[in-house]
């Protein structure tokens, strides 16, 4: 039975008017469903940032208002994607910008009773980097959205991602991944749960132990594989902070 759903994009709503969102929330409650509100990237220097909803700060303030009116105590968003990790200057410059944006909406989030849930998204942030971002911004109003599929795009075992982010997690988008050897390293393909190589018995057991009240919301994306040519020497520059221990657990 579905009892929780993450609307990860603002485009799902016909209107941002308070009355419309309140009616939608009322219908969800009748069905016993909790809605979590979300949007896309909120880092102004990210290659994937869009001005559709104004500046990064305006975008995030809109998300917080939507979350409040729809009855969501979560506002999911993300920094960007792997392209930002691979960009000149690396991911840290974008982390810095995202922290600045988050701090500018601190009062809005606290007044609304909403936790901004930053996701490890499309290879942008390793779980340890996301923790750094959350703690720099402030854990009283910023938390994490756990994405087990995106974990593999930062050379991380999803179990490690779960264990690291569980203390901060308020939302989730969960899927499996298949990882196999390639000529230059490995290839990764996201799959439906049970069709990849994640130890689901261990994963669900750890979930129950570490964050039993956190909804496990499935997000199925598949159909393509991405290669990580770690045997190439120049591959490692954007991943220089990935420890040998973490990488061995990924493999």
Predicted segment positions?
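Active-site acidic/histidine proton-transfer and metal-coordination neighborhood
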Residues: 23-37, 46-143
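Hydrophobic faces of well-ordered beta-strands that scaffold small-molecule active sites
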Residues: 3-7, 33-40, 75-77, 116-118, ...
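Structural motif
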Residues: 1, 8, 69-70, 167
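Conserved, mostly hydrophobic/aromatic
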Residues: 28, 67, 98, 116, ...
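Histidine-acidic metal/acid-base catalytic patches
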Residues: 127-142, 152-251
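A short, hydrophobic secondary-structure junction motif
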Residues: 1-5, 64, 102, 106, ...
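Acidic-and-aromatic substrate-binding clefts and catalytic sites of carbohydrate-active enzymes
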Residues: 8-20, 43-56, 83-87, 120-127, ...
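Short, acidic/polar
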Residues: 1, 52-66, 154-164, 200
């Amino acid at each position: 039975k579905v009892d929780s759903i993450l609307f990860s994009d603002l485009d799902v709503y016909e209107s941002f008017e308070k009355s419309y969102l309140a009616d939608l929330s009322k219908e969800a409650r009748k069905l016993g469903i909790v809605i979590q509100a979300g949007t896309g990237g909120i880092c102004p220097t990210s290659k994937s940032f869009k001005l559709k909803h104004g500046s990064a700060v305006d975008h995030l303030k809109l998300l917080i208002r939507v979350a409040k009116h729809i009855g969501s105590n979560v506002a999911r968003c993300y920094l960007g994607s792997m392209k930002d990790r691979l960009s000149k200057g690396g991911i840290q410059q974008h982390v810095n910008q995202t922290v600045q944006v988050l701090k500018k909406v601190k009062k809005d989030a606290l007044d609304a009773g909403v936790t901004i849930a930053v996701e490890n998204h499309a290879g942008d942030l390793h779980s340890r980097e996301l923790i750094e971002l959350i703690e720099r911004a402030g854990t009283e109003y910023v938390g994490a959205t756990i994405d087990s599929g995106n974990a593999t795009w930062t050379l991380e075992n999803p179990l490690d991602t779960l264990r690291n982010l569980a203390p901060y997690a308020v939302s989730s988008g969960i899927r499996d991944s298949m990882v196999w050897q390639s000529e230059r390293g490995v290839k990764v393909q996201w799959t439906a749960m049970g069709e990849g190589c994640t130890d689901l018995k261990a994963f669900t057991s750890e979930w129950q132990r570490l964050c039993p009240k956190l909804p496990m919301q499935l997000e199925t994306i598949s159909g393509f594989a991405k290669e990580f040519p770690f045997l190439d020497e120049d591959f490692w520059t954007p991943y220089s902070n990935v420890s040998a221990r973490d990488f061995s657990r990924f493999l």
